[in-house]
Regions:
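A generic local structural motif
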Residues: 45, 59-62, 94
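Generic preference for hydrophobic
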Residues: 57-59, 119
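Short polar/acidic secondary-structure junctions
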Residues: 38-40, 62-65, 99-100
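Core segments of cupin and vicinal oxygen chelate
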Residues: 2-5, 11-55
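Vicinal oxygen chelate
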Residues: 1-3, 7-16, 35, 48-51, 62-128
Length: 128
């Protein structure tokens, strides 16, 4: 058995790197990690990383998005209602919103390339 200790990173393929950078940095507020490089040997293809807590999220135009259902990333937010309002104001496409479970509340959106994103807020546990 292989001992997998953590997820190293999640990457989303994007068709327009500038548009994706604007969406993730300016709208969602992800802080760039400093890795924003053209991929060696692939002119015009970029890899951009964001540090989100203990995880790394990346975008790249090295391959085309499929437009089909695929992986999704969930971003934890401090204020779900405010995040949803800001995303609506920006015209972001919502797949679902106001989803409530015993442990969390969330909304499902897509980025400009149709990649799925969950905007998520954990509920305080009963023992806190």
């Amino acid at each position: 058995m292989i001992n997998i200790t953590e997820i190293a990173f999640t990457v989303y393929p994007v068709s327009d790197i500038a548009r994706a950078r604007d969406f993730y940095q300016n709208l969602l507020g992800l802080p760039p990690s400093g890795i924003d490089d053209e991929i060696e040997g692939m002119p015009g293809k970029y890899w951009i990383e964001y540090e989100v807590g203990n995880a790394t999220f990346a975008i790249s135009n090295a391959w085309e998005p499929s437009g089909q259902a695929g992986p999704s990333v969930a971003f934890e937010v401090s204020d779900l209602e405010a995040a949803v309002a800001k995303l609506k104001e920006a015209g972001v496409r919502f797949v679902a919103e106001n989803i409530d479970s015993p442990v969390c509340s969330f909304a499902l959106i897509t980025d400009p390339d149709g990649n799925g994103i969950t905007i998520h807020k954990r509920k305080p546990s009963a023992d806190q």
